[in-house]
Amino acid sequence: MVDAKQVRFIIGVIGNVISFGLFAAPAKTFWRIFKKKSVEEFSYVPYVATVMNCMLWVFYGLPVVHKDSILVSTINGVGLVIELFYVGVYLMYCGHKKNHRRNILGFLALEVILVVAIILITLFALKGDFVKQTFVGVICDVFNIAMYGAPSLAIIKVVKTKSVEYMPFLLSLVCFVNAGIWTTYSLIFKIDYYVLASNGIGTFLALSQLIVYFMYYKSTPKEKTVKPSEVEISATERV
């Protein structure tokens, strides 16, 4: 008979697969950058921000912080490698934008310093699992909610233009499923309030995007196409 812990593990594996799909979504953008040998007008911000988010969740899922969330660490570890690859490609082909290279390296250095500081505080200044989980979990939630919320800003543009041109349906749907899976994962066996908080809010935000999409879908001119530079930001939502 399957117990709650096994069910949680299975759902976590499903969440890993879906999250991997989200991490891989910008691959088309970077293939375009590689072929054109130029970053054009694509922004580096989503990928640099996701590096920070992944590092934090990798640490949160380790046994030193949370003993039952190793699947959170595994997918974010994979995501970290993918995002660093994206950033590396961006650095290779942003030669005509020297300030971008300087900014990226500066932000990455700052992120590493912050994560190292969080790790040191957690390991040497905090006592007890609850205190450690609360400290790291709250920080993770702040970053995760911000990343879930950023694509939802497109709702404002949709309402103003009465067009869903800049709100890709498939990404919104996958983000909704992803957040929903991780919300379910957080509720089974042992409630993980920090995975629950950010992904619960993420589920609501993604659902809001889908509702707005269906409200304005018919009023969108069919001949218009989605611009890659607008779509890329929507692929940054993870655990």
From Swiss-Prot:
Q: Name one GO molecular function term.
A: sugar transmembrane transporter activity
Q: Which GO terms describe its biological process?
A: callose deposition in cell wall; pollen development; pollen exine formation; pollen wall assembly; protein homooligomerization
- Domain MtN3/slv stretches: 9-98, 134-185
Give the UniProt tissue specificity note: Expressed in inflorescences, embryo sacs and pollen, and at a lower level in stems. Barely detected in roots, leaves and seedlings.
Membrane topology designation: Multi-pass membrane protein
Which Pfam families does the protein's record reference? MtN3_slv
Induction details: Induced by the pathogenic bacteria P.syringae pv. tomato.
Q: One GO term of the cellular component aspect?
A: plasma membrane
What keywords tag this UniProt record?
Cell membrane, Membrane, Repeat, Sugar transport, Transmembrane, Transmembrane helix, Transport
The organism sits in which domain of life? Eukaryota
Q: Cytoplasmic side of the membrane: what ranges?
A: 28-44, 91-103, 157-168, 216-239
Query: Which InterPro entries does the record cross-reference, listed alphabetically?
Result: SWEET, SWEET_rpt
Enumerate the Extracellular topological stretches: 1-6, 66-69, 125-135, 190-194
**Residue stretches spanning the membrane:** 7-27, 45-65, 70-90, 104-124, 136-156, 169-189, 195-215
Which locations, inside or outside the cell, does it occupy? Cell membrane
Gene disruption: observed consequences:
Dramatically reduced fertility due to a postmeiotic rupture of microspores.
Q: Does the keyword Isomerase apply?
A: no
On whether Transferase is a keyword of this UniProt record, the answer is: no
Family statement drawn from the similarity comment of this UniProt entry? Belongs to the SWEET sugar transporter family.
Quaternary form?
Forms homooligomers and heterooligomers with SWEET4, SWEET5, SWEET6, SWEET7, SWEET9, SWEET10, SWEET11, SWEET13, SWEET15, SWEET16 and SWEET17.
| Task performed by this protein | Mediates both low-affinity uptake and efflux of sugar across the plasma membrane. Required, in pollen, for microspore cell integrity and primexine pattern formation.
Tell me the protein's name: Bidirectional sugar transporter SWEET8
